[in-house]
Structure formats: C-alpha cells, structure tokens
Amino acid sequence: LRQAWPEKWPGLPLVFERAWQQLSLGVPRTGSRAHALLAFGRSVADQVERDGAQRHAQGQEPAYHNRLHIADTLVCMTYLLKASAYLKVAGASQASVAALALAIMAGHDFLHPGGSNTHPSEFEARAVQDLQPLMQAAGLDEADQEQLAYCILATDPVRVKAFHLAVR
C-alpha cells in the first residue's frame, strides 16, 4: 500500500474488502449482525475514499490522518484478528466480532480534518456524531452503535493510557 500511495492507490473500499477476505469468514447471512456491521464498514470506507480523493485533488488531504492511515489500521487489525484466531482467543473467529473490529478501524478517524484536538476527544466525538447516519442506514443496533462510539472515543491519544490500564 505504501508503494502505491498515492499515485497507484487501489482505494479504501478494496482494502476493506481484502481485509475481510483475509479472515476467511465467508459471506454473512443477510440480516445478521455481521452483515449490518460489514455494510456499515463498507459505507464508511466508500465515504472516506470519496472525501480523501477530493481533498487530495485539492492538495488538502491530511498528511497523517488520510486514507493510507485508515488502510494501515485495517491491515493491522486483520493481522491481530488472524493471530487471535490462530491462538484460539474467544470470539476471534466470530464474523460479528471481526466485522465490528474492521468497522471500528474504518471509522475511527472518520473525515478527520488533520492536526490535533484542541480539547479532549474533539475529533473522535465528531467522528462518532458524523457516523450516526451511516450506522442507522446500515441497521446497526444500539449496542453496536455504543461499542463503535466507545472504541472510537478510546482512540484519543490522551485517553489511551487509561483504557490500557482498564483492560489489564
């Protein structure tokens, strides 16, 4: 991906699809939780790609919080899920768990303006708010919306240490 960036970029939707395919979990049943989560993740990847391509064409795509960053997180999460499944970590081979994890990665810096927060969780909270219509359109239940929000808010650098301590 780094060699392709940005001139031969394959697109974030393709990266999302390949991440899912690497997990070898098949096609979730229509109407299932995993199906809704994948629909959400795909719509996020599509929107981030469109927004990023437009900003890139205008010379305004953020240097760090860009499409390549989202792709990096999708690849890393895919490796973590595959390693967890190999080690037989509870839930790691469940389609809904994997779909949720990939959806979180796709949305964690949704439409990020670049730069740093001026107050705690500023950009993360904005991402959660801006993702609400996509969550509803995908038919995510309240629990999944809350989990997505919780995990996205946890990516604020000032909150990371507290979250690490909480899961010890």
Task: Identify what each model region corresponds to.
Residues 31-41, 61, 65-66, 70, ...:
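Short coil/turn segments at secondary-structure boundaries
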Residues 42-75, 111-114:
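Active-site flanking loop/helix segments enriched in acidic
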Residues 91-92, 136-168:
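Histidine/acidic-rich helix-loop-helix segments that form or flank divalent-metal centers
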Residues 1-54:
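Conserved N-terminal diphosphate/IPP-binding helix and adjacent helical/loop segment
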Residues 13-25, 60-100, 131:
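Alpha-helical phosphate/pyrophosphate-handling elements in metalloenzyme active cores
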Residues 73, 97-116, 127, 149-157:
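His-Asp-centered metal-binding catalytic motifs of divalent-metal-dependent phosphohydrolases/nucleases
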Residues 113-139:
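Structured all-alpha helical bundle cores of eukaryotic regulatory proteins
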